[in-house]
Amino acid sequence: MTSRKKVLLKVIILGDSGVGKTSLMNQYVNKKFSNQYKATIGADFLTKEVMVDDRLVTMQIWDTAGQERFQSLGVAFYRGADCCVLVFDVTAPNTFKTLDSWRDEFLIQASPRDPENFPFVVLGNKIDLENRQVATKRAQAWCYSKNNIPYFETSAKEAINVEQAFQTIARNALKQETEVELYNEFPKPIKLDKNDRAKASAESCSC
């Protein structure tokens, strides 16, 4: 039995400040929730080993500051991502409206090989609160218009749908990682023009 190499999946969580990105990550990785809000400065990450379809993978989940002054974290931060998670607060409509700009920001910075099919997952967080202002159908319609992005309604506080959402994130990230590996195994052929071919045949003929 051949041993499979370890797979590291890079997942980036984006969204406005205060939507619960850190809380979702902590709930998923550490099964903990804190009511004390502490803004993330720059970026931080946690890792978790998970089974995806009988394969053990390590997820490296990057949490980002939502403040605009941290929005340009640099190309190196985004590059190599296998999945991008977009988070909004269902009680704050403005955080939903900015999903477009977060998605665009990621695609510009990460410049994935196949942007049309790059895996995103959207989380509508804080469904445990009563003053909901973003309807489920509205969020689903946005996701459908963006190549049918998977959508989950979550509560980091009550641990609602967090595990299920990250299972989908891991599965989609693994699929993306596998496709990139296959693509890299078959480099693009180098095309020679007529002059190059003539030059090559002349150099190989030592008569």
Curated annotation (Swiss-Prot):
GO biological process, any: lipid catabolic process
Cofactor(s) recorded in Swiss-Prot or TrEMBL: Mg(2+)
UniProt entry keywords in alphabetical sequence: Acetylation, Autophagy, Cytoplasmic vesicle, Endosome, GTP-binding, Hydrolase, Isopeptide bond, Lipid degradation, Lipid droplet, Lipid metabolism, Lipoprotein, Lysosome, Magnesium, Membrane, Metal-binding, Methylation, Mitochondrion, Nucleotide-binding, Phosphoprotein, Prenylation, Protein transport, Transport, Ubl conjugation
Modified residues (N-acetylthreonine): 2
Gene3D superfamilies: P-loop containing nucleotide triphosphate hydrolases
UniProt cross-references to InterPro entries, sorted A to Z: P-loop_NTPase, Small_GTP-bd, Small_GTPase
Motif stretch (Switch 2): 67-82
Modified residues (Cysteine methyl ester): 207
Positions of post-translational Phosphoserine modification: 72
Enzymatic reactions: GTP + H2O = GDP + phosphate + H(+)
GO cellular component, one term: lysosomal membrane
Lipid linkage positions (S-geranylgeranyl cysteine): 205, 207
Keyword Cytoplasm assigned: no
Entry similarity comment: Belongs to the small GTPase superfamily. Rab family.
NCBIfam families: small_GTP
Domain free text: Switch I, switch II and the interswitch regions are characteristic of Rab GTPases and mediate the interactions with Rab downstream effectors. The switch regions undergo conformational changes upon nucleotide binding which drive interaction with specific sets of effector proteins, with most effectors only binding to GTP-bound Rab.
Protein name: Ras-related protein Rab-7a
Organism: Pongo abelii (Sumatran orangutan)
Gene for this chain: RAB7A
